[in-house]
Structure formats: C-alpha cells, structure tokens
C-alpha cells in the first residue's frame, strides 16, 4: 500500500521522505483499528443493532489487491453511513467498489469515500476539499494595521457572540450555505480551544474584527496546523480581512515548531467564499474527499 500511496500523493508540498514517514504511521494506525476494540466501541451499537466487532476496520484482498476499509457516519449522523477507504495499493475499479460495498452491506451505506489529489475527480461527488500550504515558503506580510491576540477566558462571551453573528450573517447572504451544512464550534468546544490557546482574536487598527481557531494536529495522514474555524464580523467584511489574518498567522506559526508540516484546513464544496479566501491566504487545494455512489457498481 505504501508504494502505491506514495505515487498517488507524490505532488503534495512536502519532501518524499516526510510523506513516506506520514503514510507509514497512518497505515500502521489504520491497520491497528482492524483489532482495536476501543475504536469499534465508538460506534452506535445499540442504535444499529450491530455487534461491536462489525465496526472494526477490514483489510480486503480483491483480485490480488488490498483495500483498507472502515465504517463512518457523515457528520456523525447515524442516517448517513459510508465506507471509508483509508489505504489501498491499486486504483479503485467497479469490481472492487462492488465487493467492498458487499462486505459492508449491513452498514447500509450509499457511498464509498476516497481521498484523491487535487480538486477535480470526474467519477466522484465532492465531500470536502483540503487546502494547504507548506511552511517552507511563508508569505510576505507587511500589514501593520492587523494584529492577532490569543484569546483568554475573559474573551469567551465576545467570541461566542462573534461566532453567532458571523454565522447568521453568512447563512443570510450566501445562498448555498445554511445551518445544515455550515456550523460553528459549540460553547464547550470553544472553551477547550481557548484553554489550549488555539483561538486568535483579529484586531484591525486595535478594534476587534473577528477570530481564527487554529490547532496543531493531523488531517488524514497530513500533519501540521489546522484552521478549524474563522469568522469576520459583518461590519468588517469586504476588505479581505480573513485572508490577511490567515497570512499573518501563517507567518507567526512559521517561527514556531512548524518545520516539515502544513498549514491547512477543510472546506466544503458549497463554501466558495472560503475557497477564495484560502487561495488569497496562500493555500491551494491539494486533496479532496470524494464520494462514489455504490449504485454505480451495477451500471
């Protein structure tokens, strides 16, 4: 699997030796979930009536090729199960897709999900795009009107209000986005992010204009710093503040322990404004999660 996946993701903005290390650890972790009962215990056993062992990941051999697969639920919704392919040593053809779906038939999934390079994949339905940049070439930043300040517990109420106001405005002004596909972190998550010093308040000329949430961690097999939320207050929109703030944070993180890692985040396909912002901030689409409808195996 490692050799195939190295060739599949060869154009990612990291050295081959780094990519190899990331993929080796990823495959090791995913294979351990074939026997890890603490992993299978996370799934809705009572609601589905399926035994715990059913939710262990499975390495399937199809026509001499291997596919490492596992059960998932889109957005945690029990009514939206899918099969995730987390490792493979061959392209996915119709025969493999059909046999994988048959193996997981009790899950009643309608889709198999794969992670492919770039943004376009003709056979798939996009789930999320991964926009990222390497810390090896940080952007220039000379915008003295913009500053970032790490939020404290005293800022909690303001952050809650800012998130609420910004999301409500987005739902009202961007037709493709709504509370059904774009939601902010909840209060408990926000509190956790503040305690971990992951919330940055954006100041323009010393006035609070929005916030960024950025945490160190993994995204699939990628490692680095992940932007998990970003909002600009309605009164401050239209001046590329989000992109400018992301460039500033990018620059600041470059001087921390960011070596051999990525500055990244996921964006849903309906969120065109965030894609444009990410590109202005120096990130490009390097990977995308794509759904393949299982019914196509019977075409």
Where is each model-derived feature located?
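Acyl-donor-binding surface of acyltransferase catalytic domains
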Residues: 1, 5, 10, 35, ...
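Short amphipathic alpha-helix that is part of the acyltransferase structural core
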Residues: 1-37, 140-185
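Conserved donor-binding loop and adjoining core beta-sheet/short helix segment
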Residues: 11-104, 209-230, 234, 289
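Conserved acetyl-CoA-binding loop-helix of GNAT-fold acetyltransferases
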Residues: 92-102, 232, 238-254, 276-280
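Conserved beta-strand-loop-alpha-helix junction that forms the acyl-donor binding cleft
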Residues: 114-121, 263-275, 284, 291-293
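Conserved catalytic-core motifs of GNAT/GCN5-like acyltransferases
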Residues: 130-138, 282-298
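A conserved beta-strand-loop-helix scaffold within acyl/acetyltransferase catalytic domains
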Residues: 171-234
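Catalytic core segments in nucleotide and nucleic-acid processing enzymes
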Residues: 228-231, 235, 248-253, 260, ...
């Amino acid at each position: 699997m490692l050799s195939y996946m190295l060739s599949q993701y060869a154009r990612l903005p990291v050295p081959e030796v780094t990519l190899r290390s990331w993929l080796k650890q990823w495959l090791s972790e995913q294979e351990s979930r074939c026997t890890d009962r603490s992993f299978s215990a996370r799934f809705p056993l009572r609601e589905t009536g399926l035994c715990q062992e059913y939710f262990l990941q499975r390495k399937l051999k199809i026509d001499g090729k291997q596919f490492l697969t596992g059960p998932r639920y889109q957005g945690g919704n029990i009514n939206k199960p899918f099969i995730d392919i987390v490792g493979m040593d061959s392209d996915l053809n119709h025969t493999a897709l059909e046999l994988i779906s048959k193996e997981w038939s009790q899950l009643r999934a309608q889709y198999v999900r794969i992670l492919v390079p770039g943004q376009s994949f003709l056979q798939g339905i996009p789930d999320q795009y991964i926009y990222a940049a390497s810390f090896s070439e940080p952007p220039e930043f000379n915008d003295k009107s913009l500053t970032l300040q790490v939020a404290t517990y005293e800022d909690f109420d303001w952050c809650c209000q800012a998130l609420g106001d910004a999301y409500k405005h987005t739902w009202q002004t961007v037709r493709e986005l709504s509370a059904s596909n774009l939601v902010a972190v909840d209060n408990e998550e926000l509190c956790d992010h503040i305690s971990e010093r992951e919330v940055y308040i954006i100041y323009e000329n010393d006035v609070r204009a929005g916030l960024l949430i950025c945490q160190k961690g993994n995204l699939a097999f990628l490692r680095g710093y992940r932007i998990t939320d970003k909002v600009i207050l309605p009164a401050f929109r239209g001046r590329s503040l989000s992109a400018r703030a992301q460039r500033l944070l990018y620059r600041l993180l470059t001087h921390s322990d960011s070596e051999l890692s990525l500055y990244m985040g996921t964006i849903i396909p309906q969120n065109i404004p965030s894609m444009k912002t990410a590109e202005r901030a120096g990130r490009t689409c390097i990977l995308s999660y794509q759904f393949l409808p299982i019914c196509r195996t019977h075409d």
